[in-house]
Amino acid sequence: MSSFDRRIEAACKFDDERYYKQYHRYFDVLAQVHSVVETINGAQMLRVWRGRKFGPGASAERRERRLFHVTQDSFKRYIVPPNPRIGKAIEENGKELLIEIDVYDDHRDGLKNLNSGDFVAIQNVHAASTRQTEMQVLHGGGASYQRGITTVPVDFEHEAFQNFKKKVEAVLETVAYDENFTEFQQPEEVAENHVDEEPQEEALPRGVVLRTETCDFMDMELDNWPEGPPKTFAEAIARANNSRRPRDPPQ
């Protein structure tokens, strides 16, 4: 058996029902590429799916609350955009179908050569965690640590691979193709569509005494204004500068 065959063989053994049990462990996985994304923090995320949700069900909600998923707020750009049908499948069934892998160092070199819809065998993915979040990581080091991303030809003659491929394709056949599918907006588009709220002036609290550079020796106590106390700092300063009501300088 060749090294290529061994990589595919190991990835085909991935157990969907034990995914949420992969905590601080390393695993191989066979999957289909959804997309590759660069985040605003510079991470490069290989996003893949297997056509179904993961288990065990009792752990799903708790683990998903902590697992990192790319959002509009963290999205910077697509390195590889999603195929509209695959993107729609995730939109309809939920992001919990995605495995999103933070790819490091030399493994990044080949990401731009992937296409959404490619089948890949990924070796030695690390189910890592911090205090705030959990995420899947493909560390650097390349083949010396038996880590890597291997593209699997669609006609590869391996029974387990072909069965997996058919299952994913069967799910996609149930999804309507939408050529206008959009998952994320580019950050500049978000900025263009953002409507700024009217700025709110800071309210002027009662009992505050203001002094301005243009009104020497002036104290403005809010209750002493003939036309009523000003409502904001800007109004108070404008009215003070216009009135110029000096008080006697201190003796």
Curated annotation (Swiss-Prot):
Keywords: Chromosome, DNA-binding, Nucleus, Telomere. Residues 221-251 are annotated as: Disordered. It is found in: Nucleus; Chromosome, Telomere. Gene3D superfamilies: Nucleic acid-binding proteins. InterPro entries: NA-bd_OB-fold, POT1PC. SUPFAM superfamilies: Nucleic acid-binding proteins. GO terms for cellular component: chromosome, telomeric region; nucleus. One of its GO terms (molecular function) is G-rich strand telomeric DNA binding. GO terms for biological process: negative regulation of telomere maintenance via telomere lengthening; telomere maintenance. Pfam families: POT1PC. Belongs to the telombin family. Telomeric DNA-binding protein, which binds to two or more single-stranded G-rich repeat sequences (G-strand), with high specificity to the 5'-TTAGGC-3' sequence. In addition, repeat sequence binding requires a 3' single-stranded telomeric overhang. Acts redundantly with pot-1 to negatively regulate telomerase-mediated telomere extension. Also regulates telomere length by the telomerase-independent telomere maintenance pathway called ALT (alternative lengthening of telomeres). Does not appear to have a role in anchoring telomeres to the nuclear envelope. This is Protection of telomeres homolog 2. It comes from Caenorhabditis elegans. The gene is pot-2.
